[in-house]
C-alpha cells in the first residue's frame, strides 16, 4: 500500500520540461490568436451554429427584450389621480 502511495506522489509531482527536439512546441513558433476563445451570450445567439446549443437561452432573452420594449411603449402617469 505504501508503494502505491509513493507511485501516486511520484506521478503527480513530475514536472514537464521543454524539449528542444520539436520546434513547434515552443511559444515563438506556435503563435495563436490573442482573441479570447469564449463568446459572450450575445455573440453566441448571433451565430447560428452556437445559437442551436443555447437556443432556450437565446429565446428567453429575445422574449425578455420584446416584453421590455413593449413595456417601454406603454403610457404611464407620474401622479395618481
UniProtKB/Swiss-Prot annotation:
Its main location: secreted. Belongs to the conotoxin A superfamily. It holds the Pfam family Toxin_8. It is found in: Secreted. The cysteine framework is I (CC-C-C). Alpha4/7 pattern. Expressed by the venom duct. This is Alpha-conotoxin-like Pu1.5. Disulfide bonds join 44-50, 45-58.
Amino acid at each position: 500500500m505504501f508503494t502505491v502511495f509513493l507511485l501516486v506522489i511520484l506521478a503527480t509531482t513530475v514536472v514537464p520540461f521543454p524539449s528542444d527536439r520539436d520546434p513547434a512546441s515552443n511559444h515563438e513558433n506556435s503563435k495563436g490568436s490573442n482573441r479570447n476563445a469564449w463568446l459572450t451570450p450575445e455573440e453566441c445567439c448571433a451565430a447560428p451554429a452556437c445559437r442551436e446549443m443555447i437556443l432556450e437561452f437565446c429565446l428567453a432573452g429575445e422574449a425578455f427584450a420584446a416584453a421590455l420594449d413593449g413595456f417601454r411603449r406603454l403610457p404611464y402617469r407620474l401622479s395618481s389621480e
